[in-house]
Regions:
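Conserved short alpha-helical segments that host acidic/polar catalytic motifs at enzyme active sites
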Residues: 1-191
Length: 191
């Protein structure tokens, strides 16, 4: 069980992501993290432990952006260590995930055979690498890359993505897990 949140806004989102994660903290105490797109680049911070650990880390090394995703983790795949914390980030994509991907091992094996390395023990990093491959090698646009990846996944999950070079694009997908969308005045939310 994990908690995920995403915000696209005309205003800065980091404090609001942290507020949202505070409301979701009961869904995971093992680690927390956020990612934003700032000046077209993905920036992120994550830490083990409760949300207060991430907040303290961000006081030392702040990040900024008007679009972002966040996650609190209750470990299901992999130990509660920082490399397993979400978001999982590649060159072009950051993803947070709640749920279980039942067939992640077969995709991971295929990616390893192609020489793609993994840092974590999570099923979520596999999703990030699959979407990255579709964007960077197959030259797919983010929506198509996510759609083609998600249609192959088995399990119950909710996902939220942001992308390098796309300061107004957040994509979310779900299968079997709840995911709420919120539409505001010049901002949108997912959780």
């Amino acid at each position: 069980m994990c908690g995920i949140i995403g915000i696209v806004s005309k205003n800065r989102v980091v404090d609001r992501l942290l507020d949202g994660l505070e409301n979701l903290e009961y869904r995971g105490y093992d680690s927390a993290g956020i990612a934003t797109v700032n000046n077209s680049e993905i920036v992120y911070s994550k830490s083990t432990g409760k949300l207060v650990c991430l907040k303290n880390k961000l006081k030392q090394s702040p990040i900024d952006g008007n679009i972002g995703i966040g996650h609190t983790r209750w470990a299901t795949h992999g130990e509660p260590i920082e490399t397993n914390a979400h978001p999982h980030v590649t060159k072009n994509v950051a993803v947070v995930h709640n749920g279980i991907i039942e067939n992640f091992a077969e995709f991971k094996d295929g990616l390893l055979e192609k020489g793609i390395n993994f840092e974590s023990q999570t099923d979520t990093e596999v999703i990030a690498k699959l979407v990255e491959e579709k964007i960077s090698k197959e030259k797919r646009e983010p929506l198509e890359a996510v759609r083609l990846t998600v249609e192959k996944l088995r399990g119950s999950f909710a996902l939220c993505f942001i992308f390098r070079g796309h300061e107004n694009l957040m994509l979310a997908s779900r299968r079997g897990s709840p995911l709420a969308l919120g539409f505001g005045n010049a901002e949108n939310f997912v959780s």
